[in-house]
């Protein structure tokens, strides 16, 4: 797996869509004939408008995201080809990340470097915990609880660090980049601003659901280890 694929895969896996976020996006997924273009067309227009060098737009099946390594805004087909409010908001949000990248946002650069490392740490920590009974049988020396707990915590703590770094990046992309762009450029009507704001908030809060999922997983592992 290439470094780029690792980053993209880890980013997508780290951002499950929460129930409220999914509802907000689906609620405004109906076509808006008055829209001047689709999500994909808006993304291309904004990239040209803000002179984002070498940034391209393409369709993906891995979830909407911006790839800072390959400089690509990737949108789901349903957002790339759609004139819905959700498509427009999501496209602007992802271009917001491209703008952050061009501006040299240190938080985005830090997250990009952290993701592949955290992904490996998380995977290895879970694998070691899962294989601990087998390791104990082979070595004839059960792994101490403290070591198992430390290994388990390392992966979850690493993922929590990613969430802590990511949340402000997402809110900046939504409310310091996408919303002002859509409002000031008259890409959405004033009557639709509230709906767009809800969609952008949902996009940013997907990381909160990811953090909560990790906390639940951590609690599950602690319970399992305490029973050993």
Regions found by a protein language model. Give the residues of each.
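Polar-ligand-bearing catalytic/cofactor-coordination segments
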Residues: 21-121, 161-228
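Low-acidity, Ser/Thr- and Arg-rich intrinsically disordered low-complexity segments
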Residues: 2-18
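Generic alpha-helix initiation/capping and coil-helix boundary signal
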Residues: 7-8, 36, 145, 166
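Juxtamembrane "helix exit" motif at the C-terminal ends of alpha-helical transmembrane segments
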Residues: 1-3, 125-142, 214-228
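Hydrophobic faces of alpha-helical transmembrane segments in multi-pass integral membrane proteins
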Residues: 4, 17, 88, 92, ...
